[in-house]
Amino acid sequence: RPMTGTGMGYLNANPNEYHITMDYHLDDMKEAFYSLVKMSDGLTECYRPGTFDRWKQSFRYLQEMNPRFIYVWGGGFGYGPKCFGGSYDILGQAHAGLASVTGFHDYVGGHATKHSNWCIDWYSGTQITFGILAAIHWRRKTGLGTMIEFSQVQAATRCLGYAAPLYGRFGIVRQRWGNWDTQLCAHGIILCGKSDFPDAKNPQDRLEARYAMISAFQDEDWKELCAITGMKDLYDKYKSHKERVEAEAQIEIYAALEKWAEDKSRSEVVKVCQDAGLLAEPVCNDREYYENEHWRTRGTVRWMDDPTFGDVLQHGSYSAGLLSKTPRRLFWIWRPVGADNVKIYHELLGYPTSKIEEWYDKAWI
């Protein structure tokens, strides 16, 4: 709820959604739940396995009420020996292998790292949505709904790229490689010596605006990079991509690039590279992203007048891309829990307001 405890992390997580409260254990609430099921396309739940079945609202019960119903269990580990394990984003990143390949190699003092964002929560939602679209396609052909079983933890393995095939084929466990690329070189992020905003009050600007991305893995680009940075000895040593993509070579190459950049700002490094025809960009923070003319022109980051919270800077629904015929719509950034009880219970399901007031008095909603 605004000002009473709902965390800022909820912003942008559930735009355009109605929010109600419901106690499934009560008969009156169960009746309302079943009424929603009969008129809905489906639901997604992530309770421990068997919970909804005990409450007589699992797929086997709901499909009898609505044969077209699409039911998603977004379980933690999914069915199997650990099906009763809980589900948290950090658990998925850790247990499914993602954290082990995130961060710098221990050669430079790195360690396994959790992604700052809740990427597994977001990625799980994306994969579940894809499954729902497939279920809708199936329903159009057959007229029937289906149940989708999903493991949130295993969603992280889809972020690991070639890690599993690499181990299966060669027995090699993929390592952390930080801001470099295991398949391309030079193709990474380097630390520059000076900040673009040395006098800024915000430490994110003053201290962190020192990183630049440089890409020069093609032989001609690599030659040009070595020329403008004075690394002729490295060009002679690593003329072919096969030579410079090796781990030992990358360690030497990126150390030399950061040595070259130690008396330069991020902007200076990017300009030198871009003037030479190379791909280079600064690593931007949120403020710079917001101020970027490109994104503002596209309209993918914009201000909105949220009906509950007022002016909010957001990108939800607009950042998905530009659609040729379907307009992008964002009606609200989020809603307080229970904000739409009257709309759903009274306007949609037809319960009298006196009944809803009674539920409030009894603390049922």
Predicted regions: what is each one?
Residues 1-144, 336, 342-365:
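N-terminal helix-loop segment corresponding to the beta1-alpha1 unit
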Residues 180-185, 191-196, 205-206, 288-365:
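Terminal low-complexity tails and localization/encapsulation signals of metabolic enzymes
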Residues 135-179, 286:
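Substrate-binding/catalytic subdomain of NAD(P)-dependent oxidoreductase enzymes
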Residues 186-276, 280:
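Aromatic-enriched alpha-helical interface/lid elements that frame and gate functional surfaces
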Residues 112-123, 147, 178, 185-187, ...:
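A short glycine-threonine-serine/GTX helix/turn-capping micro-motif
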Residues 98, 124-127, 148-157, 217:
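NAD(P)-dependent dehydrogenases' Rossmann-like dinucleotide-binding region
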Residues 1, 89, 166-175, 229, ...:
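Short, surface-exposed loop/helix-turn segments at secondary-structure junctions
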Residues 76-79, 152-158, 194-196, 216-221, ...:
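Glycine-rich beta-alpha junction loops
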